Each structure stands twice: as C-alpha cells, then as structure tokens.
C-alpha cells in the first residue's frame, strides 16, 4: 500500500506525514508493504 511496490516515494512521504516518523520504505518479498521508521 501507499505507493508500494512501484512508488517508494509515496510511501516515504506518507510516513513522513505521521507524527514521530522520519519516513518510510517498501519492505517484504515483493516490496508491497509500506514500512514507516
């Protein structure tokens, strides 16, 4: 979700908008999960 697996930037900006998170990346076998950090 959130742009994954094709648009990692969308995932990153989604996570950046959540308080306490710096950004995000696509994880999983097929990079289909947006993981915030």
Curated annotation (Swiss-Prot):
Gene3D superfamilies: Knottin, scorpion toxin-like
Positions of disulphide bridges: 4-26, 11-34, 15-36
GO cellular component: extracellular region
PROSITE patterns on file: INVERT_DEFENSINS
Keywords: Antibiotic, Antimicrobial, Defensin, Disulfide bond, Immunity, Innate immunity, Secreted
Pfam family, one: Defensin_2
Role noted for this protein: Antibacterial peptide mostly active against Gram-positive bacteria (MIC=0.24 ug/ml on Bacillus subtilis, and MIC=0.94 ug/ml on Micrococcus luteus, MIC>120 ug/ml on both Escherichia coli and Pseudomonas aeruginosa).
Protein name, UniProt field: Tick defensin 2
Organism encoding this protein: Ornithodoros savignyi (African eyed tampan)
């Amino acid at each position: 979700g959130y742009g994954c697996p094709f648009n990692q930037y969308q995932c990153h900006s989604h996570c950046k908008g959540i308080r306490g998170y710096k950004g995000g990346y696509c994880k999983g076998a097929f990079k289909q999960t947006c993981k915030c950090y």
